[in-house]
Amino acid sequence: MNEDTPPFYFISVCDNFRDNTAEHVFDMLIERHSSFENYPIENTAFINSLIVNGFKYNQVDDHVVCEYCEAEIKNWSEDECIEYAHVTLSPYCAYANKIAERESFGDNITINAVLVKEGKPKCVYRCMSNLQSRMDTFVNFWPAALRDMITNIAEAGLFYTGRGDETVCFFCDCCVRDWHTNEDTWQRHAAENPQCYFVLSVKGKEFCQNSITVTHVDKRDDDNLNENADDIEEKYECKVCLERQRDAVLMPCRHFCVCVQCYFGLDQKCPTCRQDVTDFIKIFVV
């Protein structure tokens, strides 16, 4: 393939991915470009498109790996719609979703590529994974008329950018703006990105797809709750926030001690045993 460095238009495609400076993005593109030296498909335009879409060659057949979500994909055809294949085969990839926002996919697109290794959803802004960190971003410039919504917006995984009423998800990087008083913040987030791993983990797939009606019950307004129900609620309250019910079993230690929302704010250590946490299983207490 061509030895030249990637054309500069790559930067304009990628520099809005907020977690990287333009200089760092360019360095990543150069590194990805170099990895395709011995790629079996010699179509330069196709290779450039793979690079733009976050892929590097892993030196096995025609397998490529996304630098952001680590999904591994093979069996490409030169007429493949790479953007569509990436976001379809790895729907949690924040980078693939950001590029797909700019695309208009037609109907009946055929995907020839095959997923070898599933991608892992990655948090874009780890520093904002803690609820209080997100709350703190609303201190300055947030519109006074929307001040009562700050807690709900932050709990839905969003932090304030300092511009108008623009908020961004700490996990998937989607942008939510033009808020109205008393809006359902979770529904707005899910509407912007129904594939957000944080929203899916907390609210469930059905909620994100708007296929069922979700009813929120506030126990403070429910006069029918008895003392026994209150005892159960206290028994299973999250050990971190002391407010929500536990619904996450931490892996691999299997301690049942936090809610899913607080799981995303952990320092990757179980609060009970301090063992490294690699994943969680969501459960429902009935």
From Swiss-Prot:
Q: Which Pfam families match?
A: BIR, zf-C3HC4_3
Q: Which PROSITE patterns match?
A: BIR_REPEAT_1, BIR_REPEAT_2, ZF_RING_2
Q: What's the protein called, per UniProt?
A: Apoptosis inhibitor 1
Q: Which SMART domains match?
A: BIR, RING
Which UniProt keywords are present, listed alphabetically? Apoptosis, Host-virus interaction, Metal-binding, Modulation of host cell apoptosis by virus, Repeat, Zinc, Zinc-finger
State the species of origin.
Autographa californica nuclear polyhedrosis virus (AcMNPV)
The record's GO molecular-function terms, alphabetically, read:
zinc ion binding
Annotated BIR repeat ranges: 29-96, 131-199
- Is Metal-binding one of the keywords? yes
